[in-house]
Amino acid sequence: YSDYVESAAVLREKLSGFKPDVLIILGSGLGSLGENVQNPIFIDYGEIPRMRTSTAIGHKGRFIAGLLGGKRVLLMQGRLHIYEGWSAEEVVFPVRLAKLIGIDKMIITNAAGGINRDFKVGELMLISDFIKFNCVNPLAGRNIDEFGPRFPDMSRVFDRDYMDLFRSVCADSRENVREGVYFYCMGPNYETPAEIRAMRTLGADAVGMSTVPECIAARHCGMRILGITLITNMAAGILDKPLSGEEVIEAGNAASKRFVSHVAEFLRRMPLD
């Protein structure tokens, strides 16, 4: 715990008195949200002790602090993935730092493959729940009691009030936002068609390689969470073509204007209490 406290002190110092209320983690191809932050403070991950840096395509590896939608935000332009070789604890390190500097709200986004055949590329999906079957867990090992209990409840990971608010934001723009279950795979390989069929049978609507470790850590320390998925491709076996990281980035870029607008408006309407 002392390592977290020490790193949080450095982050607080770099923020020069600025006190964010909301942590925003950006997914593949969605980093352009950072360009809309007012009075930005840029902090490279490498400036924070014990903080790892992102190596994934489309992830810059820095914090941006400032105003977005009238709220004080700390934005992660580039997230960490376990497939990059980081441990689960290293992946959630920034979430715990955010908690220690006083943040108790998180908007987490990702690019994912659509499993639900009704979904279309470019649509947004509110994450209502997740499925995680692999054994990688950021809470494994000795519990850090200062963050939360040994056995945290996961029956309501994603905040229903936040979901309703984001849905109303999209409705005002006449955009239909989907809702569904996110299946977490570690990656970096894409899933096989057989795996996708199994996931669909289990009730999953989208699949991706991020988000779940951070959400587990955030709920462990009592954060309220809004999870947003951008469907950037259809999962393996649905369309007769191979999957690539480039199409994920392209779909993210194509949807970025709508995405930025919706998140900014959500922040404008979001109560801070």
Q: Which ranges hold each PLM region?
A:
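Metabolite-binding pocket within alpha/beta catalytic cores that recognizes anionic/polar moieties
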Residues: 1-154
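Non-catalytic positions within long, well-ordered alpha-helices that form the structural scaffold/packing
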Residues: 98-102, 200, 219
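Short acidic/polar active-site loop segments enriched in Thr and Asp
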Residues: 104, 205, 224
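Polyanion-binding loop/helix "lid" in catalytic or ligand-binding cores
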Residues: 147-158, 184, 196, 252-264
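Active-site/ligand-binding-proximal alpha/beta "capping" segment
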Residues: 163, 169-205, 270-271
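Zn-dependent metallopeptidase/amidohydrolase metal-coordination segment
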Residues: 209-247
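His/Asp/Glu-rich mid-to-C-terminal helical/loop segments that flank catalytic regions of hydrolases
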Residues: 236-273
